Amino acid sequence: MLNAVGHGGRAAVGPVMGKIMAERPDLRPQAKQIVAIVREVVEEVNKLSLEEQKRLLEEKYSWVIEKKLQKRREAVEKKLPPLPDAEEGRVVTRFAPNPDFVIHLGNARPALLSYEYAVMYRGKMILRFEDTDPRIKTPLPEAYELIREDLKWLGIRWDEEYIQSLRMHIYYDIARKLIEVGGAYVDDRSPEEFRRYRDEGRLEDYPPRKRSVEENLELWDKMVSGAFGEGEAVLRVKTDPRHPDPSVRDWVAFRIIDTSRYPHPLVGDRYVAWPTYNFAAAVDDKLMGVTHILRAKEHMQNTIKQQFLYKHLGWSYPHVVHFGRLKLEGFIMSKSTLKRFLDAGISRGIDDPRFATIAGLRRRGIVPEAIKKLIMEVGVKYTDASISYDNLAAINRSIIDPRAKRIMAALSPVPVEVEGLPWREKEFRIPFHPSGQLGERIVKLAGPKATIYVSQSDAVQLAKGNIVRLMEAFNIEVLGASPRRVRARYHSLTVDEARQHNAPIIQWVPATDNIAVEVLKPEGLDLVQERGLAEPAAAQLKPGEIIQLVRIGFARVDSVETDEKGKVRKVVLIYAHD
């Protein structure tokens, strides 16, 4: 059950057997009997939905979950540096995405680090949707749930959840208190006039800054009630008027947004005065008891701004850990660019496998354990990290290789006519995995003549007189070859005989029983399409399953097409890596 929950609802016999044998080596003599039992139990577990598996695990095996959490704490402690002034049981972290788009690999870093630190210190993690900009960063109604799904897929569990657009009354109350203590003022002058005073070092003399508390409260009430139009007034936080960074000087806490033109997907046009990121985030971090903020170093300026707000209200600022940017080479990670591609119809959706969105990586065949391992290895380093896809692929390969079934396929298939077969019909029993722990399939081939298919990339390498080993089957001698057709005859049966001739080993597919396949291979901004044929066992594949196309690479089943009778017509796969 634990194996299934950890791998998207699909348990595998191999890893379960490996775990049993590792913990109970005394059972090795009974391995054959045990694997039969394990296979039966795995089949039963895989019939359950992921939610049913999780429920049963929590209800019946909660001790297993706690044991796993303890191991995770110990592992995290070895990989992550300690947080400053962190007390066990009192650490509160948060992940605060903007639901204007789904999350990508870069966003996953603060999410995973915040979660892992919460686990490490037996604290709690908060999920907070920061959606207070309905005009520029318009929230997508579907993004809230999509982000939740991505986080759950990554193995992240949060203790509390908040949506900022549903907390507007709280921000209004805090804004009023800020005005009352002289920490904010309403600015109804033009942005150009404010910038002139600010940039000339005369901000102390800026007329709106000199207003009384009573005047500002009256103007604030007008802002909230809709008396001002968009761009006619803002609420500013008083800071150091001579701060060396001009952008820090009296930053904007609230602005007017015409929600009759730009309605918010959750609250419509109920509000017109909207808090900026720096105001809402700072207030929530205090009210939600956040003790440690983990975020990219690009937010360092925001930390400085928010500290002025805290000082006005007599609050203590949380500890902040800034880390560098994380970039996946060759992938687009800019939200604006990704949105532009979607709007232009260039992409196949938010889960386009060319994108570094979590959904895109998942669809491509990257498993959550690989993403977690990558992020933990990068950690909280202050320097920017540029990761090649090869690095991520290497981690992913090490995880999926032990549990991925092997399937033979011929891309751009070329027929090979084989004569002289010493049988009328022969069954080849081929294991799905070299370990022999994932079961086997049967591939049949008639005789004394038969046609098989091989990949065109192999066919063009063949020449008259070549001895070739057909994987897990027999050896042939090439009689004649062209890029479109190969003639051959039976040579011998065993691998040893093939080795004597240094024969290459290639995959093959019977001509009389096969399944059409389509492999989509992301290459930069291109999605290269390759068609082919796969062995009959491909008909058993399910969407979401990750396999290895022998000598081609690992791929994830994207879809399975059937005819009106339910017979599999085609399997579409997305290439992950070699």
From Swiss-Prot:
It comes from the Archaea. GO terms for cellular component: cytosol. It is found in: Cytoplasm. SUPFAM superfamilies: Nucleotidylyl transferase, Ribosomal protein L25-like. Catalyzes the attachment of glutamate to tRNA(Glu) in a two-step reaction: glutamate is first activated by ATP to form Glu-AMP and then transferred to the acceptor end of tRNA(Glu). NCBIfam families: gltX_arch, PRK04156.1. Belongs to the class-I aminoacyl-tRNA synthetase family. Glutamate--tRNA ligase type 2 subfamily. This is Glutamate--tRNA ligase. It comes from Hyperthermus butylicus (strain DSM 5456 / JCM 9403 / PLM1-5). The gene is gltX.
